[in-house]
Amino acid sequence: MGIHGLTKLIADQAPGAIKEQDIKNYFGRKIAIDASMCLYQFLIAVRQDGNVLQNEDGETTSHLMGMFYRTIRMLEHGIKPVYVFDGKPPQLKSAELEKRGEKRAEAEKMLAQAQELGEQENIDKFSKRLVKVTKQHNDECKKLLTLMGVPYIEAPCEAEATCAALVKAGKVFATATEDMDGLTFGTNVLLRHLTASEAKKLPIQELHYSRILQDIGLTNEQFIDLCIPLGCDYCGTIKGIGPKRAIDLIKQHGSIEEILENIDSSKHPAPEDWLYKEARGLFLKAEVVDCSTVDLKWSEPDEEGLIQFMCNEKQFSEDRMRNGCKKILKSRQGSTQGRLDSFFSITGSLSSKRKEPELKGSAKKKQKTGATPGKFKKGK
């Protein structure tokens, strides 16, 4: 889910913290990618006649096709992706997961009704609401990445938290995800739309956390205390407090405790036994991979292994797989050239003194939405 309304709030309050970029500008960059978010995108978007792609055995293959071709696209642009997979969800997320289960049950009812009435538009809509990333999807994509020579990490808990830790440790340049809570976990740079379909022609949004804090005038702790009332995955919100009021209150009072002391609780009641302190603690000290043990390596693809898995087992076209391998090998030759700025320390911040380019497209529009050891795998 991420943080409700945070994208629009940042676009309104700190537009200078958002840059729109082309994928070619990330040549030579190592980027940590929220794998679950990608798989969800692929299962929603990679479809034929409104249905997920399947092989002759009835096995879903949308996630594999999406992972294969989108990863190759990044490699061809000189990007070095590392995928981060979710581990066990935190206990605080159980209420949110329960809500999602209820929504799925409702979507199943609506889908059955739409199928009975032959309403194709609603069939497509409710089918997408039932999309769920499974352990099998994850395991198959991990196998595919290993065969492609692309590293992945199994986070001990939330993938976005481990992505942020990798950025803060200097292992990668940015976190790529659509969930804005990557910022709440403290990633210095967050990229949106990096793994979106090329057909959508969405510019990549690059958000700089230090500039957001600077322009809004908040500390890291205050930003977290802003995000919790906006709505996150770990606890409820204060009734009747929207994004504009939330930012005014946090600027005025500095913390959730002080806000609760100073608002009219009869008009704006907080949830009973509100777990905001626990949510704050999770954002501040998330369970993440031990970054000192992470050694990222990108290697040559195992072409015959790919053919065995993707063609013999999953029934993909052998010509397309071999052509994909050629593209990976060619990209490895091109990516040996480094970035000039790799010789210098990169802080990931934007200077507020220089004039920012005028935003266009989605960033300009008012949007409606807004260390414990882990398991590390690399391409063999």
Swiss-Prot record:
Cellular compartment(s): Nucleus, Nucleolus; Nucleus, Nucleoplasm; Mitochondrion
Enzyme category, top tier: hydrolase
Name this polypeptide is given: Flap endonuclease 1
Swiss-Prot/TrEMBL keywords: DNA damage, DNA repair, DNA replication, Endonuclease, Exonuclease, Hydrolase, Magnesium, Metal-binding, Mitochondrion, Nuclease, Nucleus, Phosphoprotein
Residues covered by region (Disordered): 351-380
Post-translational modification: Phosphorylated. Phosphorylation upon DNA damage induces relocalization to the nuclear plasma.
Annotated DNA binding sites: R47, R70, E158, G231, D233
Highest taxon listed in the record's lineage: Eukaryota
Cofactor info, note text: Binds 2 magnesium ions per subunit. They probably participate in the reaction catalyzed by the enzyme. May bind an additional third magnesium ion after substrate binding.
Organism: Anoplopoma fimbria (Sablefish)
Family of the protein in this entry: Belongs to the XPG/RAD2 endonuclease family. FEN1 subfamily.
SMART domains assigned: HhH2, XPGI, XPGN
GO-annotated biological processes: base-excision repair; DNA replication, removal of RNA primer
Chain residue ranges for the region called Interaction with PCNA: 336-344
UniProt subunit comment: Interacts with PCNA. Three molecules of fen1 bind to one PCNA trimer with each molecule binding to one PCNA monomer. PCNA stimulates the nuclease activity without altering cleavage specificity.
